[in-house]
From Swiss-Prot:
<dbReference type="GO" id="GO:0006364">
    <property type="term" value="P:rRNA processing"/>
</dbReference>
<keyword id="KW-0540">Nuclease</keyword>
<dbReference type="Pfam" id="PF14622">
    <property type="entry name" value="Ribonucleas_3_3"/>
</dbReference>
<feature type="domain" description="RNase III">
    <location>
        <begin position="7"/>
        <end position="135"/>
    </location>
</feature>
<dbReference type="GO" id="GO:0008033">
    <property type="term" value="P:tRNA processing"/>
</dbReference>
<dbReference type="GO" id="GO:0004525">
    <property type="term" value="F:ribonuclease III activity"/>
</dbReference>
<keyword id="KW-0963">Cytoplasm</keyword>
<keyword id="KW-0479">Metal-binding</keyword>
<keyword id="KW-0819">tRNA processing</keyword>
<feature type="active site">
    <location>
        <position position="52"/>
    </location>
</feature>
<feature type="binding site">
    <location>
        <position position="121"/>
    </location>
    <ligand>
        <name>Mg(2+)</name>
    </ligand>
</feature>
<dbReference type="GO" id="GO:0019843">
    <property type="term" value="F:rRNA binding"/>
</dbReference>
<keyword id="KW-0460">Magnesium</keyword>
<dbReference type="InterPro" id="IPR011907">
    <property type="entry name" value="RNase_III"/>
</dbReference>
<comment type="subunit">
    <text>Homodimer.</text>
</comment>
<dbReference type="GO" id="GO:0005737">
    <property type="term" value="C:cytoplasm"/>
</dbReference>
<keyword id="KW-0698">rRNA processing</keyword>
Length: 237
């Protein structure tokens, strides 16, 4: 057992107690750490593979039950948004698992893209470990509370908010939104971006995220929400 991992602390964050703690240790072991540590023989990659499938099943079931009249294509669009790397990274942040990741010295997370990838893989690996140890029920209990509310899922079914905002402003105002970017730092001290979306010299929405693309999407969605654009499109969903 690796003494660098506080098993009890991680279990408390997951609200799940492992009968096989070694599974959790493996899930928290980045391949780079195994490569640099002769006493470590397993890493998280196989558990990531399993966890990816478990996450897909849980999210699919959740959407299927939440939207009983929704067609398959629209459900697939929402599912893709809820299981992508950015979302999985957010789940890791919400659970506070990142600080427990064992990663090699040569694999330091130096930018947002590397962090997103490592944290997304971490969530999938931990979910795979929970599934192997306790089955689908505890994996579901961990995952579902992390998912957005029904109201927040609805916009995901309509596609990229930047595209929708552009269509709105072109159709109704015959103009295009302008995105202004300034530096931003998260509560964890990670540098990111603050985006303001301007329409006709007026701030319609703002968003902050670790990636510029995600911050722009958040700002665009805030703009759509503020101008009540989504309501007429999602009332019957």
């Amino acid at each position: 057992m690796n003494n660098l991992i506080n098993i009890k602390e991680v279990e408390a964050k997951l609200n799940f107690t492992f009968t096989q703690p070694k599974l959790l240790v493996t899930a928290l072991t980045h391949p780079s750490y195994r490569n640099e540590t002769v006493t470590i023989t397993e890493d998280s990659e196989r558990l990531e593979f399993l966890g990816d499938a478990v996450l897909c099943l849980i999210v699919t079931e959740h959407l299927f039950l939440l939207f009983p009249s929704m067609d398959e294509g629209t459900l697939s669009t929402a599912r893709a948004a809820l299981i992508n790397a950015v979302s999985c990274c957010q789940y890791t942040d919400a659970l506070g698992l990142g600080e427990h990741l064992l990663i090699g010295k040569g694999e330091r997370i130096q930018n947002e893209r590397g962090r997103t990838s490592a944290y997304a893989n971490l969530f999938e690996a931990v979910l795979g470990a929970v599934y192997l140890d306790g089955g689908l029920a505890p994996a579901r209990q961990i995952t579902v509370p992390l998912l957005p509310s029904k109201k927040d899922i609805l916009p995901l079914m309509l596609g990229n908010p930047k595209n929708r905002l552009q269509q709105l402003t072109q159709k109704q105002l015959r103009t295009l939104p302008v995105y202004q970017c300034t530096p931003w730092t998260s509560q964890q001290g990670v540098p990111g971006y603050h985006i303001r979306v301007i329409v006709n010299d007026e701030v319609w929405g703002e968003g902050c995220a670790l990636s510029k693309k995600e911050a722009e999407k958040l700002a665009a969605q805030k703009a759509l929400d503020a101008h009540d654009y989504e309501n007429k499109n999602t009332m019957d969903l």
